[in-house]
Amino acid sequence: MKTTTLGKSPLKVSRLCLGTMMFGDQTPLEDARQIVADAHDKGCNFIDTADVYTLGQSETMVGQVLKGQRHQWVLASKVGNAMSALPNEQGYSRSWMLRAC
């Protein structure tokens, strides 16, 4: 798989990024392990997740799947999405971004 430089960083990432929106909801852990392994075998080293995906289950599952191989992957996550109706559990404030990560 072709790679590209991520912005101005020195990171080289695969041109395709594995999305994990359904991990933790419609994708059980063992299926997620197989999906990630297959992607890696094809040259993918870039995974996308977000705190809002299945209310954090996706990020948790990605962590479980990558345990012991974290150094082989580049992770992209998103913040800002509302995790609840509470005003301090959404948006782009410094405190929320640190808590979300």
Whereabouts are the PLM-identified features?
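N-terminal binding-site loop/beta-alpha segment at the start of enzyme catalytic domains
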Residues: 1-77, 81-83
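Glycine/proline-rich, positively charged
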Residues: 86-101
